[in-house]
């Protein structure tokens, strides 16, 4: 976990140094208070003492207390600043790291776990930092100076303090040994609870459609009960520990006064006053030693939970993406817009067998390649290899004449416009969604935004909205229909002006008329752009230059619509299930 603190900025490190200086000053002033108290006690009990003497010492005591208060406030402000900045920076590091991870890495953590690590875990680390900066620095200094002040006092008082300290450490060590294993379990159960909650919220329509409310409620209750029971166990351990500590502290105070009473009773005449004042001062310093131990123990009690959180955050930050970025920023001019698969094999991580086998084809600039096949044939997996969502298991993929592994991530993404199966919109407005992301192409003007919306067949419904392109988009685009979201997503891909456009079954929510108009616009307006279309509907792809037929991860046919109708049994079966006899002729 302590590796995370290397990410503290220079400003934060300076603030921590100032905290150290202020805490030393604060402790020094606090330790003067018992000495002033002893002096006042002696003055009060000494015949002939002047009131001015008592007031003088009392004034110094008041100034010391006020100085300690001011320094403690300054320390609190600095610590709050450091912990807040550190938490914000850590979230940013974690967010940037997650964005750089491959799909394989992200699925290994799970989205619910990544959300928990970005929020709850970092909050735990912040809380530890707040406590640690104040208590870890303050406690050893306080304990050391207090022990130095009482080391020359009565040995029996010192022995009582040592016994109390050992008893306190023993109780806390036992409590921590019981509770620490549960801290990691609690974080895992937090992930589980977040996962179930997220499933319920994102799948609420399916849950209602299948009358599965009771099932999901039970699923949530099971996760919630496990989480609650673990929390109760940990809290019971802590609840037992705290009163035990205070019993020890009170017992130490009683022991000091009981020993003091015996010593005063047995001392020679004239030493009672000195012993009495020593007893008052010793009890105060002893409590400061014990409180210092207590503060350290509180930090150590929080540390295991913070360490679990820190390890979880570090696990993400230390994960090296299995997608190694290349160095090339441009393709070969003579192969611009080309895509070529050369004997590509692919299997998902931890899978037993390849789901794509010996895939070989080439698409030239401006051509349209359609990919069709039965469910589970590997269509989406194939096109996800082009932008390197996953890397091939064998063979190679060339984009613009270079292996995709040779490109920088930015350069490869700039060459490709990708429209996923699920239309993803981001909160903001329509214009922000269309011009979303960075590109090496020039910024879009208003008329260009209008134009790409027209190509995507989105301008018609956008113009009917009261605010047009400035119309608000809710989270995940929930205020738009599936077809509208798909058209905005398509406009976003076109707006990047890529060399290659990839559509992963991205016309599925469009009616036949809009589908046909969109395909026509793509052919006429983007004639020089290479297009790859994954589709389930034969009607969406029959005009493609090439149609690639997949079955069980293998190419079983490639050609035009007419050629495949005559020669390919798989394509014939798909076409016959969708087209009329007249359309098949």
Task: Give the residues covered by each predicted segment.
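ABC-type nucleotide-binding domain
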Residues: 332-585
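Helix-loop-helix
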Residues: 48-50, 149-163, 233-311, 316-317
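Transmembrane helix-loop-helix hairpins at lipid-water interfaces of multipass membrane proteins
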Residues: 10, 16-74, 78, 151-156, ...
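Juxtamembrane helix-loop junctions of ABC transporter transmembrane domains
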Residues: 21-22, 29-42, 64-111, 115, ...
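An intracellular "coupling" helix at the cytosolic face of ABC transporter transmembrane type-1 domains
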Residues: 10-13, 103-104, 120-129, 133, ...
